[in-house]
Design a protein with these regions (language model features):
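Acidic (E/D-rich), amphipathic helical modules within compact regulatory domains
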Residues: 15-61
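Intrinsically disordered, low-complexity regulatory/interaction regions
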Residues: 39-49, 53, 75, 80, ...
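Structural detector for short beta-strands of small beta-barrel domains
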Residues: 1-12, 61-87, 113-114
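Generic recognition of long tandem-repeat/solenoid scaffolds
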Residues: 19-22, 86-90
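Flexible glycine-rich surface loops and low-complexity tracts that mediate binding to linear polymers
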Residues: 41-55, 81, 108-124
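Beta-strand/loop nucleic-acid-binding surfaces
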Residues: 23-38, 91-111, 116-121
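Short beta-rich binding modules
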Residues: 11, 22, 26, 49-52, ...
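A structural signal for the main folded, soluble domain(s) of proteins
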Residues: 40, 57-59, 66-71, 75-77, ...
Length: 124
């Protein structure tokens, strides 16, 4: 899904590290596709791409507010939301993955936690 994102910061040492604000969430992402120089304070169109490099860690949870929580100082996040039609929906964001339908369809309509290794952003 394409979002309007506000660029909040760009790391001076790692140019692919971009801080954004989207749907009220402040996220630090890895810019996997950066076709132009970004300006802090400008709004751009971009797609958020959760990356899982190994095993999918998905768990049903309860009594937790949907959110996107950064794990440590890297690009890893724990995404908490409701699973709907193969998409994890939380705080105005939607993260879709065919694995949700194939392997986790039994969690449809439930609140789940998903561990992603890296949250990429692709500017369009």
């Amino acid at each position: 899904m394409i979002y309007a994102v506000l660029v909040d910061g760009v790391n001076s040492e790692i140019e692919e590290e971009v801080s954004i604000v989207v749907c009220g969430q402040r996220l630090t992402c890895f810019a996997s596709y950066l076709p132009y120089k970004l300006e802090i304070g400008r709004v751009y169109r971009a797609e958020l791409l959760p990356m899982v490099f190994g095993e999918y860690i998905v768990q049903e949870i309860s009594h937790v507010t949907p959110s996107v929580l950064r794990e440590g100082l890297g690009y890893s996040y724990r995404i908490i939301g409701e699973l709907r039609d193969g998409c994890l929906c939380c705080s105005g964001l939607s993260f879709c993955d065919e694995i949700f339908l194939a392997d986790f369809g039994f969690l449809e309509g439930k609140l789940i936690s998903w561990q992603v290794d890296r949250l990429d952003i692709s500017f369009v």
